[in-house]
Swiss-Prot record:
<comment type="subunit">
    <text>Component of the nuclear pore complex (NPC)-associated TREX-2 complex (transcription and export complex 2), composed of at least GANP, 2 copies of ENY2, PCID2, SEM1/DSS1, and either centrin CETN2 or centrin CETN3. The TREX-2 complex also associates with ALYREF/ALY and with the nucleoporin NUP153. Interacts with BRCA2. Interacts with SRCAP chromatin remodeling complex component ZNHIT1; the interaction results in inhibition of SRCAP complex activity, preventing the deposition of histone variant H2AZ1/H2A.Z to lymphoid fate regulator genes and restricting lymphoid lineage commitment.</text>
</comment>
<feature type="domain" description="PCI">
    <location>
        <begin position="210"/>
        <end position="391"/>
    </location>
</feature>
<keyword id="KW-0813">Transport</keyword>
<dbReference type="Pfam" id="PF01399">
    <property type="entry name" value="PCI"/>
</dbReference>
<keyword id="KW-0653">Protein transport</keyword>
<comment type="function">
    <text>Required for B-cell survival through the regulation of the expression of cell-cycle checkpoint MAD2L1 protein during B cell differentiation. As a component of the TREX-2 complex, involved in the export of mRNAs to the cytoplasm through the nuclear pores. Binds and stabilizes BRCA2 and is thus involved in the control of R-loop-associated DNA damage and transcription-associated genomic instability. Blocks the activity of the SRCAP chromatin remodeling complex by interacting with SRCAP complex member ZNHIT1 and inhibiting its interaction with the complex.</text>
</comment>
<dbReference type="GO" id="GO:0045579">
    <property type="term" value="P:positive regulation of B cell differentiation"/>
</dbReference>
<dbReference type="GO" id="GO:0070390">
    <property type="term" value="C:transcription export complex 2"/>
</dbReference>
<dbReference type="GO" id="GO:0003723">
    <property type="term" value="F:RNA binding"/>
</dbReference>
<dbReference type="InterPro" id="IPR045114">
    <property type="entry name" value="Csn12-like"/>
</dbReference>
<dbReference type="GO" id="GO:1905457">
    <property type="term" value="P:negative regulation of lymphoid progenitor cell differentiation"/>
</dbReference>
<feature type="modified residue" description="N-acetylalanine">
    <location>
        <position position="2"/>
    </location>
</feature>
<feature type="modified residue" description="Phosphoserine">
    <location>
        <position position="45"/>
    </location>
</feature>
<comment type="similarity">
    <text>Belongs to the CSN12 family.</text>
</comment>
<keyword id="KW-0539">Nucleus</keyword>
<keyword id="KW-0906">Nuclear pore complex</keyword>
<dbReference type="GO" id="GO:0003690">
    <property type="term" value="F:double-stranded DNA binding"/>
</dbReference>
Amino acid sequence: MAHITINQYLQQVYEAIDTRDGASCAELVSFKHPHVANPRLQMASPEEKCQQVLEPPYDEMFAAHLRCTYAVGNHDFIEAYKCQTVIVQSFLRAFQAHKEENWALPVMYAVALDLRIFANNADQQLVKKGKSKVGDMLEKAAELLMSCFRVCASDTRAGIEDSKKWGMLFLVNQLFKIYFKINKLHLCKPLIRAIDSSNLKDDYSTAQRITYKYYVGRKAMFDSDFKQAEEYLSFAFEHCHRSSQKNKRMILIYLLPVKMLLGHMPTIELLRKYHLMQFSEVTKAVSEGNLLLLNEALAKHETFFIRCGIFLILEKLKIITYRNLFKKVYLLLKTHQLSLDAFLVALKFMHVEDVDIDEVQCILANLIYMGHIKGYISHQHQKLVVSKQNPFPPLSTVC
């Protein structure tokens, strides 16, 4: 394949289309396949050759693919992205013309994936040249992928086996990757609705479902819906193949903060196994109610946490750490009427700066409001009066 002529290549394309061989056709238009490195196929003007062998719109689609290999050979990703746009547009025309059949779904997967990758590369080249802002090309790519999604979602005529609806989840996952990259998470909402209401949602491939749950779980985390985030991210982690260490680690980066907010602390063995020791001091600090250690741990690994987009989520652990510290005060004093001064002493011991009795009341009021403490503040007696039953409810029942 790395040395075939243009005529041999086009003959293979013709046969794949003629026999409705989606998998072979997908390889012949994919940048994951070795033919793209063949100098004989990297052509600046392949239109005439393609028109001699292929019917429209496939002639236009594969001519654009050969121009794309030429552009990539010259490291011109802006041109490669333009060519890939033509490929997807031509494919869409052919795809819509395939009534009640879905043999071309693998082709759609290949061209959609390459579109996203080239959009990303083109973005980087344009930003370096100062010609556009980050995400412009990705945003345009998303619009084109949405056109593909609409074609798949509106296929109501075909039987379930031949339905284009099988392509919906792959496209949703590609769109999620773009929306997370350009920070437009609100655009995920209608896509989540479409998948959750689909009667195929449990029948897609495990790999696609893992990717979907991973992104929806991350979105739930940002929306502070920690129970749903835990459910979706746990599904992704548990179903991810054990050999995919890198992917499991990536899921854990988001699952760990969610679990911690729900009161489940990771073991040191788990953190070691997945090279996530950045969380070890955070875990220790929250468990012990040690605000001093928590602030130090967040500061020490701030760059890593910010890069992963979880720093602000981890900041929410401060309220849990207050709760654990104040629970220690309660266990130490063994009374249901706790002097506010006792909490003030505990906070000063943790080097909380400029803390006074008003701040103690403010923190306690927050903890009571959020359901972390069952009780009330008696301002007259300067005491916290806690419930005799379960004054510090388990975190998993509160969040």
